[in-house]
């Protein structure tokens, strides 16, 4: 089954003629996984996200892991968890008319959500969003890393009305030995872990620069990448890009 999935990803980006359509802006897809090392249902979703990252070379297929903090009470404090990511998940819950949140939850382009370990729905999302026009494109340039400070220049194309642009610093990969809680005595590998994120109103300014800091708990020389995406007020993502440091 694993190899069939890898074959699916490979053929999707190398043989699907829809990817060669002459569009104003290339298709993209952003997978935002809300996960926790304290949740026993999350490792299969973490693994599936890892496979998407590992087996697609297309820079417009973007995966992000947001570690929420509400399962820390079960005995294991997820070292990557932040309250702000729980708050972001509740923003999506309001959009989807839900009064509660769950893990693992996979949000796709801010438009839809499903259980993060659902491979068939993930495949359908890949087919759908990698063949659709997009209203924004982002270019990142002149990325400078000095110590813990990362500076980024950016340029956004397309409709900018009422939109915001977000920049996330993600840790490419980390394996953690979980000592307590539902995943006690397990090694869990997480991919593209969001460790810092800033959001800016675009306000008709297509060009700009911003900066992100590597938090003190992380090593300066670990492998990181920058992810940028544009959103409407309703949280729909209308453009995205990523670059490794």
What are these regions (language model features)?
Residues 79-102, 111-112, 116-245:
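Short, conserved sequence motifs used for protein processing/export or organelle targeting and
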Residues 8, 13, 46-53, 170-174:
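Short N-terminal helix-initiation segments at or just after the protein's N-terminus
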Residues 106:
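Ligand-binding face of N-terminal immunoglobulin V-set domains in extracellular IgSF glycoproteins
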Residues 4, 69, 111-113:
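Short, internal active-site loops enriched in acidic
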């Amino acid at each position: 089954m694993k190899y069939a999935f890898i074959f699916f990803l490979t053929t999707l980006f190398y043989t699907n003629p829809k990817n060669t359509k002459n569009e104003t802006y290339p298709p993209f897809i952003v997978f935002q996984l809300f996960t926790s090392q304290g949740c026993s249902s999350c490792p299969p979703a973490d693994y599936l996200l890892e496979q998407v990252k590992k087996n697609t070379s297309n820079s417009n297929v973007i995966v992000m892991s947001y570690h929420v903090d509400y399962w820390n009470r079960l005995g294991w404090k997820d070292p990557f968890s932040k309250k702000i990511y729980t708050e972001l998940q509740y923003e999506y819950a309001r959009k989807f008319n839900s009064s509660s949140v769950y893990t693992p939850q996979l949000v796709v382009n801010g438009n839809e959500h499903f259980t993060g370990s659902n491979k068939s729905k993930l495949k359908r999302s890949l087919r759908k969003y990698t063949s659709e026009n997009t209203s924004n494109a982002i270019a990142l340039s002149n990325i400078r890393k000095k110590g813990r400070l990362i500076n980024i220049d950016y340029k956004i194309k397309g409709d900018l009305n009422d939109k915001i642009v977000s920049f996330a610093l993600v840790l490419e990969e980390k394996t953690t030995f979980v000592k307590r809680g539902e995943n006690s005595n397990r090694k869990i590998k997480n991919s593209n872990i969001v460790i810092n994120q800033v959001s800016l109103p675009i306000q008709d300014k297509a060009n700009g620069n911003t900066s992100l800091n590597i938090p003190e708990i992380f090593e300066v020389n670990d492998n990181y990448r920058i992810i940028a995406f544009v959103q409407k007020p309703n949280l729909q993502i209308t453009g995205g890009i990523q670059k490794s440091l």
